[in-house]
């Protein structure tokens, strides 16, 4: 896999992204970009480097979450690498959902082309009018009329929906507002070309629209899809989101470690190659200490993520949720700090178009909001810790000893 990235992905990356800047239609990959991307994907397939993220040996490589952790950390060093192995978000989470709970018909129509890397997909959770980190707040409605779901509502920051290759959205909707709070939601498959579905605009991130994938604002007005498009049955939306978001969160953190590694390499390279006041700038101020702290933080993050991955393998996603929240609250924040330190040692170049660091920083900063903001994950961890204390007589006695 490392050889594939070095020989087939790194050499095409600069040309791929430069071509994107020249596109007349920024939401479509041009022929040369597709040629470069498909060439790298075909080489990955030929080498058996495909769908590593799926633990099912029939549809993926049969790797554990712990196995995949090492791979994803390497993929994180080049943003294009994951797509060449068909391991890109949000497709990975959507494929895992379809693989686990999709009907044979849903798998044939949507999972099969996703597994083959023929189409892309998106996931519709976040809404502009409510605090969407609490899934109970989701207000987009789906009413069953005859044999069709009629869907109304808005979603925004729907990652990847701007890409012309994106054909299907898994959408979180409210199907029964009178049910118990965690049984009100369902998830429904909505083709993006369905009448009534409108891509209103790309939402910007730090002023950038991130074409060609983007984060789109979507409005649905009387969108109709067949009754059979519901996933796993009505009222299962919250359970599906946990199936999907658990692995997704840890995959993001795995890739973040790769980004932190790359930032540290860039920091050291800059420090050794530039002089000021008669010295290499690596030897000025606290730069050596910064390098030390960065390496320590990277190794701490790596061990935490590996522990969370092992917990998922042994305990299951639900029982490992506290460990997943630990790494999700920890890793993007620390990766941001390491990238920020790398920017600082680069000076003005660190925030310019001549450096990959600005884009790296933006992606890590987004992760502190995506798939649950830091505060939600800290709350999950703290709640578990308080509950553990209250159930432990040993801890209570020890804390009261003088």
Residue ranges of predicted features:
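Short Gly/Pro-enriched turn/cap motifs at secondary-structure boundaries
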Residues: 129-133, 159-164, 177-179, 205-214
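Alpha-helical interface subdomain recognition
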Residues: 1-82, 88, 101-106, 113-118, ...
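Flexible, small-/acidic-enriched active-site or ligand-binding loops
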Residues: 137, 195-224
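Short, conserved phosphate-binding/catalytic loop or strand-edge motifs used
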Residues: 88-95
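Flexible, glycine-rich active-site loops centered on histidine and acidic residues
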Residues: 95-101, 123-124, 178
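A short, Trp-centered hydrophobic/proline-enriched beta-strand micro-motif
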Residues: 117-126, 170
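A short core secondary-structure module
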Residues: 148, 152-200
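Short, surface-exposed charged micro-motifs
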Residues: 139-141
């Amino acid at each position: 896999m490392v050889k594939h990235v070095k020989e087939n992905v790194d050499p095409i990356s600069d040309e791929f992204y430069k071509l994107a800047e020249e596109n007349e239609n920024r939401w479509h990959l041009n022929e040369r970009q597709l040629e470069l991307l498909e060439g790298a994907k075909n080489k990955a397939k030929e080498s058996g480097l495909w769908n590593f993220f799926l633990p099912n040996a029939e549809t993926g490589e049969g790797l554990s979450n712990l196995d995949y952790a090492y791979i994803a950390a390497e993929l994180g060093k080049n943003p294009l690498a994951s797509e060449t192995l068909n391991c890109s978000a949000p497709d990975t989470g959507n494929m895992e959902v379809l693989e686990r709970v999709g009907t044979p018909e849903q798998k044939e129509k949507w999972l099969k082309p996703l597994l083959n890397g023929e189409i892309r997909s998106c996931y519709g959770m976040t809404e502009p009018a409510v605090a969407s980190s609490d899934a109970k707040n989701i207000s987009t409605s789906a009413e069953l009329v005859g044999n069709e779901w009629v869907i109304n509502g808005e979603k925004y920051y729907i990652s990847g929906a701007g890409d012309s290759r994106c054909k299907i959205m898994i959408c979180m909707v409210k199907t029964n507002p009178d049910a118990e709070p965690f049984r009100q939601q369902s998830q429904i498959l909505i083709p993006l070309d369905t009448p009534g579905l409108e891509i209103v605009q790309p939402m910007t991130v730090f002023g950038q629209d991130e074409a060609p994938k983007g984060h789109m604002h979507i409005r649905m007005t009387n969108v109709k899809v067949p009754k059979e498009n519901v996933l796993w049955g009505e009222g299962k939306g919250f359970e599906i989101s946990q199936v999907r978001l658990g692995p997704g969160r840890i995959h993001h953190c795995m890739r973040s470690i790769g980004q932190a590694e790359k930032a540290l390499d860039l920091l050291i390279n800059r420090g050794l190659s530039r002089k000021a006041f008669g010295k290499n700038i690596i030897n000025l101020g606290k730069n050596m200490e910064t390098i030390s702290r960065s390496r320590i933080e990277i190794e701490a993050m790596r061990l935490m993520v590996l522990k969370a991955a092992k917990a998922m393998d042994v305990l299951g996603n639900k029982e490992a949720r506290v460990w997943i929240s630990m790494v999700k609250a920890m890793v993007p924040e620390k990766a941001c700090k390491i990238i920020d330190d790398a920017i600082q040692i680069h000076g003005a170049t660190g925030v310019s178009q001549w450096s990959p660091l600005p884009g790296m920083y933006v992606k890590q900063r987004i992760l502190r909001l995506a798939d649950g903001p830091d505060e939600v994950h800290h709350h999950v961890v703290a709640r578990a810790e308080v509950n553990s204390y209250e159930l432990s007589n040993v801890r209570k006695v020890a804390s009261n000893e003088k």
